[in-house]
Amino acid sequence: MINIIECDDYEVAKNLVLDYSKIKGAEACFVSLDKELSDLEGFYKGGALLLGYENEKPIATIAIKKINDDMAEAKRLYIKPEYRGKGYARHMLDAMLDKCRELKYKEVRFTTKPEVMSIGYALYKKIGFEELENNDGTVLMRMMLTL
């Protein structure tokens, strides 16, 4: 079972994001990685950084970045490979959406690369994210939230 909490250890979060950044083909998702990692707390101010634990071991992350008072961007959904296939990504997404509602966001956006992250892309569509645009294989998706 996964236990999801707001980040209380930025070094743990940094290591998970670094693991995620090594996924082959996902390099374009990390253009501002150095800036992000140098101040995770500041980078996600007005949003949140959530960590997922199994048996007290950090295994997952997802972040919420404030765009404006009504809109946030979900970022950095990552489950360590050995923990995939257990439904944890869905739990992380649900926790992220709950936190967005708590923060009073009306819209959440997500950018993904379906050819690299096909399972995640299918899950986003399954839970209600809609595709807004596709630029050379990078897809912008959104979900409108009810508070």
Residue ranges and their predicted role:
Residues 4-75, 80, 93-94, 99, ...:
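Acetyl-CoA-dependent GNAT
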Residues 28-31, 35, 83, 87, ...:
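Residues at secondary-structure transition points
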Residues 69-70, 85, 116, 137:
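Surface-exposed, flexible loop/turn segments at secondary-structure boundaries
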Residues 79, 85-98, 122, 126:
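Conserved acetyl-CoA-binding loop-helix of GNAT-fold acetyltransferases
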Residues 80-81, 105:
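Short amphipathic alpha-helical segments at helix-loop
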Residues 104-147:
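C-terminal "cap" of GNAT-fold acetyltransferases
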